[in-house]
Structure formats: C-alpha cells, structure tokens
Amino acid sequence: GRIPLKDRRYRYSCLNFMLLKEMVENISKMPMNLFLDKEFYKPMEMNCTAYLPLRQFKKEEIVPTVKADYLRKGKVLQGYVHDESAAFFMGGVSGNAGLFSTARDVAKVYQLLIDGGVYNGKRYLSRETCDLFLTHTSKISRRGLGFDKPDVNNSVKSPCAEEAPEEVIGHTGFTGTCAWADPKNHLVFVFLSNRIYPRPFDHKQLMRLNIRPRMQQVMYQALMK
C-alpha cells in the first residue's frame, strides 16, 4: 500500500521540468524540440518559436540576452539559453528553459489552455488536461500544476496584479518575462523584456519597481472602466 509522506515542504526547483523533458523524449521517441515543433509549433503557426533558434533564424533577429557574464567570459549571449542548467547540462533544450519565442506565439499557448485545448478549430490537448492546469492548486504553496498563481493572501508578494483573480495561471522568467492566462475573464497577458542586458548583475529594477504586476494592473483597470 501507499505510505503517506511526512513533513511535506515546498521547494522551488527546475529538476522536475528537466525530468519531464526526458519523459517526453522517452514516450515520443523524438528529441523534445522536434516533437513540440511537429505537434504544436508548426500546426499552430508559431513561426517564431524554437529551441536552439540559431539553427533557423539569423542572429540579428534574436534579442541579445546578456553581456559580460562571468560564465561566458565577457561575450554577448545571443540565441542560446541563459539558464545554466539548460545551457550546460541539457544542451540548450530543457523543460525548464531554452525556448525562444515572441509575445504573439506565447499568447497562442495560453489561449489554447483557456479554450480547453482547442486552437483555431483543432484540438491539441484534452479538456481534462487543460482543467488540471487551470484548476489545480497546491495545498502547501500558492502554485498550481506547472504554473504559478496569484497570492490572494499577500498582494505584496504576489507575482500578479492585485486585481488578478485566483483563477489566473502563468509564470515569470528570470530574464524579465512573464505570461498569465485568466480563464475567468478570458484574458491573456504576455510581457517580454530583457532585464539582464547589458549588465547581468544590475537587474533588480524590474522587480523593485514591480513593473510586471503594474502593467498587468493597467490592463485590469482598463477593463473595469
């Protein structure tokens, strides 16, 4: 029988998503980047979304990520993942990092979830799968299944605007990104910035000024007028 776990504690980690990449490849018998390209990105016309983007885009088409990073010996990192685990252990393709995209393409994925797994008339995910992502909330943290959520009990620590309902799911990214889906109001909010370029160790302003939640707040306030 199953023995219940004791002293359960929450730890934020990338390891589970790195393992998910291995699971996808084991089941699909394909590299994850090729599997996603075949099953999602191409049919959804996500033409600006890719792992290892330098294989299909010009360097000038990709925003530089960082300069003078001590791990890259002062070179400009452009077109390759910034996350150290994905970069040095996963070859640039991982479940936790490495995907390059645009706001429009990212919004398509979140719209797919809001619409129950259907995009542009074609089903990509079952409604049951989407419901798991949209409704599950951890009992020991504010997070959902694979996504972050608003902290409805502490607006100061919440990654979302205070006006965001508890149904919202999404995530922020270290390099200055965030994307949120609001199934209650049928909204998608995507914000892509580049806070660690050119100075990798001077990137606190985005968080200090609370830019991402404040921009999301503007969206909600506009809807309330």
Question: Where is each model-derived feature located?
Answer:
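Short, gly/Ser/Thr-rich active-site loops of penicillin-recognizing serine hydrolases
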Residues: 115, 119, 128-129, 138-139, ...
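Short beta-strand segments enriched in hydrophobic/aromatic residues
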Residues: 24, 113, 183, 192-195
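Glycine-centered small-residue hotspots that permit tight backbone geometry or close packing
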Residues: 79, 173-176
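Short, surface-exposed beta-strand/loop micro-motifs that present aromatic residues
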Residues: 168, 175-188
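Glycine-rich, flexible loop segments associated with nucleotide phosphate handling
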Residues: 160-172, 205-214
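Short, well-ordered beta-strand elements
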Residues: 186-194, 199-203
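Short, surface-exposed loop or secondary-structure junction motifs
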Residues: 1-167
